[in-house]
Amino acid sequence: MVDGDTRPAVARAWIPLQPERAMQTPNDLPQPETVVVTATAVPARDLPVVGAALTIGDLPAHRDWLLEAPRDLELQSFVDAEVLNGDWAPAVAEARRLLDGHQGRLGIHGPFWGFTVTSYDPDVRAVVRKRLSQALDVCAALGADQIVIHSPFSTWGYNHRGLYPADAARMLDAARDTLSAALARAADMGVTFVLENIEDKDPADRAQLADALGWQALGLSVDTGHAHYAHVSTGAPPVDFFIRAAGPRLHHVHLQDADGYADRHWPLGMGTILWASVFAALRPLGPVPRLIIELRDKAGVIASARHLASLGLVR
């Protein structure tokens, strides 16, 4: 939780690496002393507890599971513009009723359809600022303290890095114009925005952008399926390197399985992600980020949690 404006006096300039070195290789990225690819013996009391990404409509079927342990929850009912522009107060009231007794941390997935947080169009940036402000309004009403937003980095942009030298500064200026007001308000509220990898090929890009913006109210999220897609389909490093590259800014992880071809959001164990390596990368980072199972079919959430428990990775 953040109290007030915690920006450093001078934010570090964000400068992408040269094209031939733009993406850090696995050897360049932060490494633990020992890379572990199989589950290690960790006392059960020290294992993390997983939560889930659900809509309000999914809560009744998962309420007992959510309340049996301090499970973190990400509500995904406040993503659409139609919802944010409408009367969402009844939805918040219903969520609060269903979550009575919930002891985990609460966040929301913020709006993302149709825009990026680094648009070069000032009119689009104005719309994005409005959407982020609306998301903060929802957090205030819900008592939530985290908002997931999407990374602006893409494979297209990565492959053209260096061809347009002004792009890095222009992107940073656009991000600052779009996000600064929301981050200032979030800091006052004790809310953290987390920037989720989408098409990111270089795991370090989001951390560099967050460092350049300089707000502690901006953290990072890693989506395991998105990272696996980037690894298999675009040549990015594997999922565990995305975890390590996020470092101390990692506040949130979307746990979903995939085959690396598409954004599957399969139940955990159905795809080809090496879960032992993911959790080995998480272990040295310190405070446990929110571990959020995010599936297309919510009926697989509890079974996915049990799968991780059977591997000795979570409680």
Identify the meaning behind each predicted range.
Residues 3, 8-136, 140, 314-315:
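N-terminal pre-domain/capping segments
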Residues 14-17, 24-48, 60-68, 117-118, ...:
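Histidine-acidic metal/acid-base catalytic patches
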Residues 47, 70-72, 101-105, 139-146, ...:
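A general structural motif
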Residues 48-54, 73-75, 106-108, 147-149, ...:
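Hydrophobic faces of well-ordered beta-strands that scaffold small-molecule active sites
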Residues 55-57, 76-80, 111-113, 152-154, ...:
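Active-site beta-loop-alpha junctions enriched in small/polar residues
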Residues 89-92, 122-133, 165, 169-176, ...:
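Non-membrane alpha-helical structural segments and their capping/turn regions in soluble enzymes
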Residues 91-102, 178-185, 277-281:
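Catalytic-core regions built around general acid/base machinery
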Residues 118-219:
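Active-site acidic/histidine proton-transfer and metal-coordination neighborhood
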